Amino acid sequence: MKILVINPGSTSTKIAVYENETPLLVRNIKHSVEELSVYPQVIDQFEFRKNLVLQELEANGIPFEFDAVIGRGGLVKPIPGGVYEVNEAMKRDTLHAMRTHACNLGGLIAEELASSLPHCPAYIADPGVVDELEEVARITGSPLMPKITIWHALNQKAIARRFAKEQDTKYEELDLVICHLGGGISVAVHQHGRAIDANNALDGEGPFSPERAGTLPAGQLIDLCYSGQLTKDELKKRISGRAGLTAHLGTTDVPAIIKSIEEGDKKAELILDAMIYNVAKAIGGAATVLCGKVD
């Protein structure tokens, strides 16, 4: 079976081609803030990212012949983890999603490419809205704002299964804390194959990341909302997109930040240390959900 895999992220587009379990092509195309800023909305990147996929296939001499196409799942309605075929209902949910992120393009691009091939289905797997939370984890300090979780379920569950295989056991038999470090950062508690707690890594919970603010002081955020300084859309971008490292240092490029630290940039060192500190604190907190008994 020949499979095309498409993973659009906030700072990259990952592309792979597999013949059964053998990788024939693996590419990770990085995108700068400037490159993506020409598109007013994430959905406007559809043709750009789709054409990147086609260009990579052509550049590497891979014929456009596949048995299945799978894309990163979008921010549809909350669902349990698993593999889902893209259908009209999923496309509608994705196009009218309450939140925007590049992952919304994954299933749409997969379906568009698959539809041009005979008998080729399009799938998504473990989208970022996977919801397996314990009920106690949903409760916040305000009944107006129950916890929702948007996290890197695809990568986290893949890593969990790989770790289980390395340990000669099953994901469903392990208790794990897993952290995804990318444009956004998510920390989740996996108990016997279910992610019973995870932060909302997209719009305002957990550690700050290369392009997201993470948890912010609620009072100061309210004051900023009513200050008249920023519009609603501008405020949202200060939480996700133009926040975190890019707000402090003007870039999401961690290797470049490390290089500037090596050259004596003390501000960059402090900001990067602060991100690492917050990530470590979140991992430690997640371990308490399992009473410290982490495999």
Region roles according to the model:
Residues 3-44:
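Short glycine-rich, Thr/Ser-proximal phosphate-binding strand/loop in the N-terminal lobe
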Residues 53-67, 166-169, 283-294:
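Phosphate/pyrophosphate-binding loops at sites that engage ATP/ADP/AMP, CoA/4′-phosphopantetheine
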Residues 237-291:
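Adenine-nucleotide phosphate-binding core of ATP-dependent small-molecule kinases
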Residues 48-60, 109, 159, 278-283:
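Short, well-ordered amphipathic alpha-helical segments that serve as non-catalytic structural scaffolds
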Residues 2-6, 66-70, 176-180, 186:
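Short glycine-aspartate micro-motif
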Residues 105-112, 124, 139-175, 183, ...:
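Glycine-rich phosphate-binding loop plus the immediately following alpha-helix
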Residues 57-103, 121, 129-141:
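Short beta-strand-loop/turn "lid" adjacent to the catalytic site in phosphate-handling enzymes
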